[in-house]
Amino acid sequence: MSTRTASAGDIKEGSYIMIDNMPCRVVEVEKSKTGKHGSAKARIVGIGVIDGVKRTIVVPTDAAVEVPVIEKFTAQVISISGDSVQLMDLRNYQTFEIPSSYIEDEAKGKLEPGVQVEVWDVAGYKKIMRTR
C-alpha cells in the first residue's frame, strides 16, 4: 500500500485521502476555528474510490493524514468469466484478475476480450476506470 503524508489543512476538494484505510475522493472540506485555546479542525468528507461509500473524518488542521499514491496503467482484457475479469498489464505482460464489483459503471457494458482499459492501482486495490 503506497501512501504519503500531508497536512489535513492542505487537503482540497477533488484530492484523494485515506479514510478508514480506504482511498477516498474528497468531495467536501470544512475548516472551523475553535475556542480560545483550541486548535482549528478540518471536517473532510470523501467517497470511496473502490466501493463508493461516503466517509467522514474530523481532524486538527495541523494533523498528518495519509494520501494514497494512484498508479494508472493500461491493460488488455483477456477473458470475462462471471464475477471476474482477467487482464494483462501492457507494461510487463503479467496477468491478474479483478472482481466485477471493481469495475466502473461506464466501462461495464464495453468490456470484451481484446479491449484496452485504464486501471487504477490505489492502495493495493485495482479498479477498471474506463475503456480506451
Swiss-Prot record:
The keyword ATP-binding does not apply. GO terms for molecular function: ribosome binding; RNA binding; translation elongation factor activity; translation initiation factor activity. InterPro entries: IF5A-like, IF5A-like_N, NA-bd_OB-fold, Rib_uL2_dom2, Trans_elong_IF5A_hypusine_site, Transl_elong_IF5A_arc, Transl_elong_IF5A_C, Translation_prot_SH3-like_sf. Keywords: Cytoplasm, Hypusine, Initiation factor, Protein biosynthesis. Its main location: cytoplasm. CDD domains: S1_aIF5A. Gene3D superfamilies: 2.30.30.30, Nucleic acid-binding proteins. It is found in: Cytoplasm. Functions by promoting the formation of the first peptide bond. This is Translation initiation factor 5A.
